[in-house]
């Protein structure tokens, strides 16, 4: 399953969720608005912006239509090849 870490008032988060829904991708939303521990954990892992999207095989941060398209094409596993 895909997890999308978001925060209230995050335009990139909304764009990511809307595009994933439009492409028929199932995902869990993890709202970290009031979860400072989770926000810190994501920062320690190197993520500096939201949303953070975690698939079975990889993760990325920010609005990334290319990665979302890969997930839609390949199921929950995004292509591991970096471009």
Where do the model's predicted regions map?
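Local sequence-structure signature of Cys/Sec-based thiol-disulfide redox active-site neighborhoods
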Residues: 1-25
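ATP/adenylate-binding site constellation spanning eukaryotic-like Ser/Thr protein kinases
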Residues: 7, 35, 47, 65
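Thiol-based oxidoreductase modules, predominantly thioredoxin-like and allied folds used
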Residues: 25-38, 49
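Short acidic DE-rich linear segments
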Residues: 76-83
